[in-house]
Regions:
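Secondary-structure boundary elements
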Residues: 207-210
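The conserved phosphate-sensing helix
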Residues: 222-229
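P-loop/Walker A NTP-binding region and its immediately flanking N-terminal helices
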Residues: 4-11, 15-186, 193-194, 212-220
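Conserved phosphate-handling catalytic cores of large alpha/beta enzymes
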Residues: 198-203
Length: 229
């Protein structure tokens, strides 16, 4: 029997919106839709045209520079980083800057072991280390990362994501291509409509009935944080 989402379902909003796009599967496996439906390619990512063209350019070149991706929560920084690696066929190591990324020795040992080895299966020119939420790492960890970027430049690329780029030390800025995930005002309606359509597509796939005005309310409430919708 199909579930129907109605206007009453968004009361209280904080609870119902969380339920709208977060689903526990019938097989008792907890599976967040944000992961299940995460875009696998840059083409699938909902981005301003100018930003998407930058990443498409990297794909045409067949490699990426060191990147610093900056923008608010849920705008697609991590998704873009993973999509780039997926399309380039790059091995990727993810380190969470809010967790293990705060410990100097952990970062040093993990990165060195990974970056100093050559992949036997990947056809990409470089391996990738993704430092997610890099603005939550400590200053000494950032100084270490600066050194690692230089030490392993022939074999490895680094992608840093952050909400606040002012919390990233200048030496890392200068060693990366900095890309701001900001949507020009003129493109905001287009981006919101694209995500509105994406949500409806997901609900249709999951066979969940819905009212369009409820989906629109979700997008309007949390835009541009798409992860929360």
């Amino acid at each position: 029997m199909m579930e129907t989402l109605s206007t009453m379902d968004i009361l209280p909003v904080s609870t119902t919106i969380a339920l709208l796009l977060t689903q526990t599967t019938m097989s008792d496996k907890l599976f967040l839709w944000v992961e299940q439906y995460r875009p696998k390619t840059i083409e699938e990512c909902i981005l301003p045209d100018s930003t998407k063209k930058v990443f498409e350019g990297f794909l045409k070149q067949g490699e990426i520079p060191n990147l610093l991706l900056s923008g608010g929560a849920g705008v697609g920084k991590t998704t873009v980083a993973k999509a780039l690696c997926n399309q380039l066929g790059s091995d990727i190591l993810v380190i969470n800057g809010s967790d293990e990324g705060r410990f100097l020795e952990t970062v040093r040992n993990t990165c060195k072991v990974y970056a100093s080895t050559v992949s036997l299966t990947s056809k990409a020119r470089h391996k990738v280390i993704l430092i997610d939420e890099a603005d939550n790492t400590t200053p000494d960890v950032q100084l270490l990362l600066r050194a690692l970027v230089e030490e392993f430049q022939k074999n490895c690329r680094f992608i840093f994501t952050c909400n606040y780029k002012n919390k990233i030390i200048a030496p890392l800025h200068s060693r990366c291509s900095v890309i701001d995930f900001q949507t020009p005002s003129a493109e905001k309606p287009q981006i919101a409509r694209a995500f509105f359509t994406r949500i409806k597509d997901i609900l249709d796939i999951e066979k969940i009935k819905y009212e369009e005005k409820v989906v629109a309310a979700v997008v309007q409430k949390f835009y541009p944080d798409f992860r929360r919708t």
